[in-house]
């Protein structure tokens, strides 16, 4: 049965009416004054993550209408279809099974009766590959002659492992340094190579097809540098994370780890693409990372919608985007190790849900993915928080805080936590008794995600939470969250422009591109 498009459901009309009568004038300060139990009602526990949703512009009635919208658009059926291995990526005719990468060999409770029988063989392949990858990771960790690991990839082959290695810095094996090269801009690779010695470096080439232009350009340059510096054993100092084993072998690489076409790039950190993380934190740590994500999978798959954290977050995103008209969300992790977390979420959400047509290719009359942006706190307070507090646009903020520090420097962590609590409070309560430039309107919404500690398990759960939250909003909007056709046109045109930069031929180009090309060649 084809789900009903969200704007054609009774729940959508009810939500429009609710926004006009209550939502647009909703006052957080008044809501707390009238309801002593608001914090408890709008707080939600989930594996490794506690969420305070109480500072959002929503009441119980509106949330019930949002839950009804989810039901009327077939969210539960769509979720179950994903976990059943159905080809819900309809434009590419692929299943969406990144969750299988973190499913234990025997888990009889994954959703409607676990891993379906037809996926048992695939799950076995997943764990065979995982064991081989972790064995390699442990060998690299034990090899004291390898001090530098360079991951060459782009998009999901870069952002995921880079974000995770940085986030789990407290767990990284001493004596190993990790570098990530993604940009085709040679300055990035050159800056890394200047710090390396070929005999102590391992290069990981991460490309599913082993044809990605940026990645292979960097890989060839890294290989040329290695050989020019006297390196001779390509097979020992290069490994490939790819499905194109033949191309890797032709490159001179004999050690390869593959994955499957149902693993999208932005969901690939759980696969062989996570090898840098496995080397950094070890096999035990990587298994904990997978286990944390799997715990969130179970939560999403089995907990009723009203107590399901990814569902509540995803529906809140729909409420803000389509009824309040908010076009962006600020991500503010109050932990310096999460410095690449906002960038990771940018790709996850904006590449997944930044679509203008539905899953059937029909143009949509309503907004989809918001713009995500942010920086770690407290740095962001001295950059863009001015606009969050006193700007003309309301931007929902999503804070992430960690209860326990991974250092023993006295006073620092308490001050950090005081700041994140104060910012969330200030956004809500404002300062009405001051005039003019010192007036803070308040009533600015925020969500607060709290981890007990930043560990492999809690990071895995946090990432999986965000994956499923994006699934929820994309499902309600009726879009395919698992393709990314929007990245293709620029790549095609870049090949043509590269030839023109060499030849100078501007025939058929628009005036602006022709003028810029001529100036670059002058």
Swiss-Prot record:
Database matches in Pfam families: PGI
Pathway: Carbohydrate biosynthesis; gluconeogenesis; Carbohydrate degradation; glycolysis; D-glyceraldehyde 3-phosphate and glycerone phosphate from D-glucose: step 2/4
EC number annotated for this UniProt entry: 5.3.1.9
Primary localisation category: cytoplasm
Keywords annotated in UniProt: Cytoplasm, Gluconeogenesis, Glycolysis, Isomerase
Taxonomic classification: Bacteria, Pseudomonadati, Pseudomonadota, Betaproteobacteria, Burkholderiales
GO biological process: gluconeogenesis; glucose 6-phosphate metabolic process; glycolytic process
Residues at the catalytic site: 351, 382, 491
Membrane-spanning intervals of the chain: none
Source organism, top-level taxon: Bacteria
Sequence similarity: Belongs to the GPI family.
EC category: isomerase
Reactions this protein catalyses: alpha-D-glucose 6-phosphate = beta-D-fructose 6-phosphate
Protein name, UniProt field: Glucose-6-phosphate isomerase
Compartments reported by the entry: Cytoplasm
Function in brief: Catalyzes the reversible isomerization of glucose-6-phosphate to fructose-6-phosphate.
Gene from which the chain derives: pgi
Gene Ontology CC: cytosol
GO molecular function, one term: glucose-6-phosphate isomerase activity
């Amino acid at each position: 049965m084809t789900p009903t498009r969200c704007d054609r459901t009774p729940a959508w009309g009810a939500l429009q009416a609710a926004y006009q009568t209550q939502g647009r004038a909703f006052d957080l300060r008044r809501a707390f004054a009238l309801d002593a139990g608001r914090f408890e009602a709008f707080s939600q526990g989930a594996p490794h993550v506690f969420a305070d949703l109480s500072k959002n512009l929503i009441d119980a009635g509106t949330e019930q209408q949002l839950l009804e919208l989810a039901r009327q658009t077939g969210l539960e059926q769509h979720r179950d279809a994903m976990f059943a291995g159905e080809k819900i990526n309809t434009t590419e005719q692929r299943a969406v099974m990144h969750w299988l990468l973190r499913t234990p060999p025997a888990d009889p409770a994954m959703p409607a009766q676990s891993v379906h029988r037809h996926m048992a063989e695939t799950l076995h392949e997943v764990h065979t590959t995982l064991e081989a990858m972790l064995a390699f990771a442990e060998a690299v960790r034990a090899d004291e002659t390898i001090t530098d690991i360079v991951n060459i990839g782009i998009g999901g082959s870069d952002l995921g492992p880079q974000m995770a290695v940085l986030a789990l810095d407290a767990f990284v094996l001493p004596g190993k340094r990790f570098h990530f090269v993604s940009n085709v801009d040679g300055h990035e690779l050159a800056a890394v190579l200047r710090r390396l010695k070929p005999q102590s470096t391992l290069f990981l080439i991460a490309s599913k097809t082993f044809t990605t232009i940026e990645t292979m350009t960097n890989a060839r340059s890294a290989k040329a540098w290695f050989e020019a510096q006297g390196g001779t054993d390509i097979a020992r100092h290069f490994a490939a994370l790819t499905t194109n084993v033949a191309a890797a072998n032709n490159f001179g690489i004999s050690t390869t780890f593959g994955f499957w076409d149902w693993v999208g790039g932005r969901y690939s950190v759980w696969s062989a693409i996570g090898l840098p993380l496995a080397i950094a934190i070890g096999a035990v740590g990587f298994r904990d990372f997978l286990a944390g994500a799997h715990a969130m999978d179970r939560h999403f798959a089995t907990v009723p919608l009203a107590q399901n954290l990814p569902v509540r977050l995803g529906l809140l995103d729909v409420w803000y985007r389509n009824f309040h008209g908010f076009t962006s969300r600020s991500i503010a992790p109050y932990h310096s190790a999460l410095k690449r977390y906002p960038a990771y979420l940018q790709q996850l959400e904006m590449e997944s849900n930044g679509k203008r047509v539905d899953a059937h290719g029909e143009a949509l009359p309503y907004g989809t993915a918001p713009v995500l942006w942010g920086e770690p706190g407290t740095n962001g307070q001295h950059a863009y928080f001015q606009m969050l507090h006193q700007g003309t646009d309301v931007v929902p903020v999503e804070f992430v805080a960690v209860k326990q520090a991974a250092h023993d420097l006295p006073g620092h962590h308490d001050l950090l936590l005081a700041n994140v609590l104060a910012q969330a409070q200030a956004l809500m309560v404002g300062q009405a008794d001051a005039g003019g430039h010192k007036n803070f309107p308040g009533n600015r919404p925020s969500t607060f995600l709290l981890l007990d500690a930043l560990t492999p398990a809690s990071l895995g759960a946090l990432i999986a939470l965000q994956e499923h939250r994006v699934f929820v909003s994309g499902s309600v909007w009726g879009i395919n969250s698992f393709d990314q056709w929007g990245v293709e046109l620029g790549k095609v045109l870049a090949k043509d422009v590269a030839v023109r930069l060499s030849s100078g031929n501007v025939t058929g180009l628009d005036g602006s591109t022709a003028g810029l090309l001529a100036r670059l060649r002058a």
